[in-house]
Amino acid sequence: MSCSVAVCNSPVFSPSSSLFCNKSSILSSPQESLSLTLSHRKPQTSSPSSPSTTVSSPKSPFRLRFQKPPSGFAPGPLSFGSESVSASSPPGGVLKRKRPTRLDIPIGVAGFVAPISSSAAVAATPREECREVEREGDGYSVYCKRGRREAMEDRFSAITNLHGDRKQAIFGVYDGHGGVKAAEFAAKNLDKNIVEEVVGKRDESEIAEAVKHGYLATDASFLKEEDVKGGSCCVTALVNEGNLVVSNAGDCRAVMSVGGVAKALSSDHRPSRDDERKRIETTGGYVDTFHGVWRIQGSLAVSRGIGDAQLKKWVIAEPETKISRIEHDHEFLILASDGLWDKVSNQEAVDIARPLCLGTEKPLLLAACKKLVDLSASRGSSDDISVMLIPLRQFI
């Protein structure tokens, strides 16, 4: 007999909890199915010395033939009438138990989210097994590509037409590690928290302090969640009254094209930075190298971010903020996870994106994002790669 079990995937973009969410624009994806065929086999005698029972053993007269599942699919219990066959390890020992992957404190990065269109665009969640996500939004484009891991852990967010003003917006890219929870939480909450804190602030120091409160509030809220795991690097760009406010915690980076010259607006937070290493050691932590990479407590390769409860004493959520007045020669802004920057330099990224952003009648922002992502992948990046491009002259 044969049995087909339809496994419904969650939508690529699910509703956001943000105040600006527009549920009408949620996208959905087609179903995928897992097909299993069970055929009866005549019991065969086996050697008494064999301690285990295989799929074709006398104790198991049914042979399971599994067709290759969809990419990223994790098998769960499959029901056959009143009985069930589990892909883990049923009591009869039909299938061999596998030791679960250990994810206590993540090493390395992985690191994605997409916005819902309306007068305000807000982050939503893609399927974890989604291979690629792209979006051409109102005044920005973004492209994200999954690395070699089973789940996409990068997220992004964008709110345009903020407070009904087309010259106000906030964008973000989030690179998760140790799971998607922290990046997803940040993408749904950080921009909202920043906007709430910044309202009414005029002085640059007040704005920078307000952004810091937004980051810290997001981190504190995430750590109160149940089953908190992993963390996320963050980079955000707030456009307010002609000012560009760029903040980061971790190694997501913001780079601006100024007349074709790359200008970094953020500095990566890694244990290899002298000031970061000194801060960590002063508070009782230690930094060492593992396979040539500087890590905190021999584990994490970034020194700031949202989450990372086990290392919270040293992995702080406080961002560094840089505020610039948008000028005419400020052409576009690149926000990207380290999946890009580990393989592509700041100037090279600007040189590749600029002809597509400025050299055509209609800017080909999405094509530029894809070109940068593909270049990093072609150079051997195994990480998730997320690139967002934002033309800046629209805000002058």
Swiss-Prot record:
GO terms for cellular component: nucleus; plastid. This is Probable protein phosphatase 2C 25. Interacts with MPK4 and MPK6. Binds 2 magnesium or manganese ions per subunit. Its main location: cytoplasm. Its cofactor is Mg(2+); Mn(2+). It is found in: Cytoplasm; Nucleus. SUPFAM superfamilies: PP2C-like. GO terms for molecular function: metal ion binding; protein serine/threonine phosphatase activity. It comes from the Eukaryota. It catalyses: O-phospho-L-seryl-[protein] + H2O = L-seryl-[protein] + phosphate; O-phospho-L-threonyl-[protein] + H2O = L-threonyl-[protein] + phosphate. Mn(2+) 1 binds at residues 175-176. Residues 44-61 have a biased composition (Low complexity). Residues 139-392 form the PPM-type phosphatase domain. The lineage of its organism: Eukaryota, Viridiplantae, Streptophyta, Embryophyta, Tracheophyta. InterPro entries: PP2C, PP2C_BS, PPM-type-like_dom_sf, PPM-type_phosphatase-like_dom. Induction: By wounding. GO terms for biological process: abscisic acid-activated signaling pathway; defense response to fungus; response to fungus; response to wounding. It is an enzyme of class 3 (hydrolase). Disruption phenotype: High jasmonate production and PDF1.2 expression upon wounding. Slight reduction of lesion size caused by fungal pathogen. Slight decrease of spider mite reproductive performance. SMART domains: PP2Cc. Mn(2+) 2 binds at residues 175, 338, 383. Changing residue 178 to D: Loss of activity.
